[in-house]
Structure formats: structure tokens, C-alpha cells
Amino acid sequence: MYLGIDVGTSAVKALLIDENSVTLAEADVPLRVSSPKPFWSEQNPTAWWDATLRAIDDLHRQNPSAIAATRAIGLSGQMHGATLLGADDKPLRPAILWNDGRATRECAELDAALPDLGQRAGVATMSGMTAPKLIWLQKHEPDVFAKIKTILLPKDYIRFCLSGDKATEMSDAAGTLWLDEQSRSWNQSAIEACGLTRDQLPHLVEGSDVTGTLRATLADRWDMRNDVIIAGGGGDAATGGIGVGAVSHGDGFISLGTSSQIFVASDKYRPKPEELLHSFAHAIPDHWFQMAVLLNGASCLKWAADLLGEADITALLNRVEAQHDAPSDILFLPYLNGERTPHNNPHARGVFFGLGSDTDRETMVQAVLEGVGFALRDAKSRLHKAGTQCDLPGVIGGGARSRYWIKMIADILGKPLARYEGATKGPAFGAARLARLALTKEPVADVCVKPAIEEVIEPDLTRHDAYRPRFAKFQRIYAALSDEFTPD
């Protein structure tokens, strides 16, 4: 049995699979995000650990014999989160998350100090990355900065709690700006530019490597054997790719999770920072990927549903679909948490345009869904400019539950999309696969097979044409407002 753990933004998810990749038990424990100031986004690392314990306890209750037979654990997690440990190996402050926008000035300073950083790190300097956050801390919380013994990423804090090992792997390290993507090693000049030393970073492994074994006290808690290994794992984008078999050149998918991504696997390192793409090491050796990253995805739908008092999202979507016979009369910029591709603007915010006294909640929700679709089309254009293609991307993540939304996105993109069986398993499933690879050393192709395609959803080209002028207006509205998003 193989256990996958995903430390997400909204929840910790744990999933147990057998030798045939059949899910035997799964559990979700919700998390909360704190925003103590505008553009700040933080979580307490101890909340991740508490949620992880509760999730595995739940698996143990569901299927005690299967959890007892666990042989390996794989880890996945939200990327970029600066998790700082002091001399006692306890967190010094809340972790600063991927969608935190406080370190914009520090990005400019880092670019000035290291003009070639984008080519080596595979991405333009962005405030959500780990490195500029440390420069911000050095300036604004010098007492905390001076006490830093170790910097970990979210899933790697859970690794430390599980096994006592301080390690990370290539796909998650990629999001720090401290990794040299081509050589898959730490970039000493980037580390020093942040006032840090190599000793403050964890050692690097591949996602399919073993980093340690489960602590005896935890093995006893869950009635596990005493030699359960911990695999390197991956950042959530890479583990999502492992989960849907996106490991060969050109394999890809669209993720509709809290954030959204268009992910395409690559056989080489192909940096395109000028297009605001992420060109990162994959979670398996000698593989990379290119990715357009949107900071907002299915979270926009949840935000709208919560705001409108709609507890049953499925029923809400059914009502929206029933009245949807044309593009919405209103537009929505889905930048509730800023945006990366194609704007690199952490200060951008959500906008409804065209509201009238006759606007109903279904029309507003349709606009929200279309806004995410338009943002995906905007981001996809950057992949196209980079020469990156994916013939039939599947859609994964929580948003993939809605066939209606997938069909809408296919219409907006003018591109067929695949619905996978088990598309909502997500990164935890990929983490479990990496656990298996670490234990068995099987060929990647034998383990990371693609899921069965439940349906290929073809675009309605008439509706695609109807969306063209709406998309153009969507772009014009952002361009008109972009300067207004800058804080006073």
C-alpha cells in the first residue's frame, strides 16, 4: 500500500492506494488562510501538521488493515511557501504563501542583483516565489530573519515532522528561485543575494528518491511497520502531472484547483521567463515541464457561491447551465489573488463589469466561470508563443467535477478537452505514485500511466466565435485598469 499526502491551501488530503492504483481510503481536513494585511497570505505550519495527523487518523479508522500494510509515503504540497525554523526546529512565524504579494519591491532588487536569474531559475522573479519573501523578511522582520536555521517548503515541513529529515526535491525547489533548473542543483549566487547560506536550505533529492523512514512513534500510532519509507514527492503541479501520467514530452493537463495551471511536460529545460511561464524540473529525474500559472481557479467559484449564500454548488451550476444559451452580458476579471501568467501582477484584483439592476446570481456565476476560462485562454497564448503544444489536455482538480464548466472552457479555447476517470484525485494520487517509485524502482512508464478518458469534449465553434469579442473586451478591461491596481 502507498500513502499520498497533499498539503494544499484549502485542505490537507491523504489518499491510500494499492498495487493496482485503486483508492482504498481518502480523507480531507480543511485549512484556513490568514490575511493580516492587504496582499498578505499566511498559514501556520503547525496547522498543516495537525491536519495531516487528523487525515491519516481518518484513513486508519476507515481501513486499518490497509493503513497497516503501508510501505511508502509520498508528499505533495502547495509551492513557494516560506516555512522558517529556528534553532529548536520550530516555526518562527506563520508561513508566507504562494499567493502573498508583499514582496514586489524585493523582486526588482533581486533582478537588479542577478540579471540572468530568470534563465537559470526558469521563471521571471515574482512576489509569490520564496526568494523575494526572504529579502522582505530581512528588511521588515530582522529579528526573525536572524534566527532562521532552516527554510523548508510546506510539504517538506510535513516530511520533517514525519521522519526528522530536512530535504526537498527538484520540482518544489524550482519555485524558490534558488534552484539552477538545468543542473538541478542549488544556485549559490541566488542564495547569497538573499542574505542566506547553503546550510540554511535542505538537501536536494529527486521526487522518486527515499529521504528517510517514518518515526517509530508515528508507526505505532497507525499500526504501521517500522520500515515505512518517505519519498521525495513533489510540488503540487508536478505531482498532479505524475497522477495523470503527464511525464513524456507534450503530455499536458489543465488544473482547476484553488489556483489553475496549464501544464505541459518536456524532455528538456526550455526557459521562457519573458513569457511569464514557469519552466521547472519535474518530480522525476531528467524531466522538466513548462507551465502557465493562474493564481485563481475553482476558488473563484467557491468565493462567488459563498458570497451569494449558495451552499450547494452543484445545484447552483445546474441553474446556471439551464439559462446559459450565450456568453454572459457581464464580464469578470478573476484576479482575486493577483495574477502570474500573463500579467505578473500580485496587486490585480477581481472586477465585475456590466452589472445592472436586472443582473441575477446565475448570470454573475456564469461570468465568474467564463472569467476563469478567459484567463486560461490569455495564459495559453503565452505557451503558444513559446512554441509549447499539447494536443489533448485533460482537466483535473475540483473544477473538473463540472462537465458544464469543462465544456465552457473548451468553447472559449476552441480546443477539445478530455475528462479523465478519477480526475479529482489530484496531487495526493501523484504523491502515492512517487512513493511506489521510491520503494520499487519500477520504470516510470509502468507506474505513471494515463487515466482512462471518460469523454472527449469538443468545442462548439459557433459559441467559440461568440466568445471572441467578449475575450477581447476582457483583455481591454484589464489593460484599462492595470495601473489602478497599484497600491496607493
Regions found by a protein language model. Name each.
Residues 44, 100, 236:
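Short, conserved phosphate/pyrophosphate- and ester-handling motifs at nucleotide-, phospho-/glycolipid
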Residues 67-70, 199, 327, 390:
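Short secondary-structure junction motifs
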Residues 194-206:
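A conserved helix-loop-beta module that forms one wall/lid of the active-site cleft
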Residues 3-4, 104, 110-124, 129, ...:
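Active-site core segments that coordinate phosphate-bearing ligands/cofactors
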Residues 63-98, 123-128, 159-180, 203-206, ...:
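Short beta-strand-loop/turn "lid" adjacent to the catalytic site in phosphate-handling enzymes
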Residues 63-66, 197, 386:
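Extracytoplasmic/secreted proteins and extracellular or luminal domains
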Residues 1-94, 119, 147, 219-220, ...:
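N-terminal glycine/serine-rich phosphate-binding loop of ATP-dependent small-molecule kinases
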